[in-house]
């Protein structure tokens, strides 16, 4: 194995599955392709790439995400162009989702925001990506 493996899927633990399904449906303008429940595990799944949110019946009450703890810092969704990245602030505004400004760094440009469980999300355009629409 000489190359870094591709990511297969992302799964985030949320406090309220139904509330999160509704939030991500509005964000992506797409319903999940599957909602499942098995024992204490409940999940909703979107494909391309595979993205899931899940809630366990035995969660810590009142817990919220904090990227300063060991574990996940944030999840970034890729943008194919600068035009696509620049379209997201208006979309987030229309949804009433607070966000920062697009930040240009040496490794790429990103727009950070948070879901209702305080999980930091980002739309990201790596350096070397298309700058055209």
Regions of interest found by a model, annotated:
Residues 1-21, 72-77, 129-133:
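N-terminal beta-strand motif that seeds the catalytic metal site of vicinal oxygen chelate
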Residues 42-45, 73, 109-111:
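Short beta-strand micro-motifs in enzyme catalytic cores
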Residues 48, 69-72:
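Short connector loops at helix/strand junctions that flank enzyme active sites
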Residues 59-65:
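Short beta-strand/turn micro-motifs at beta-sheet edges
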Residues 2, 11-52:
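Core segments of cupin and vicinal oxygen chelate
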Residues 19-21, 82-87:
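Short, conserved charged micro-motifs
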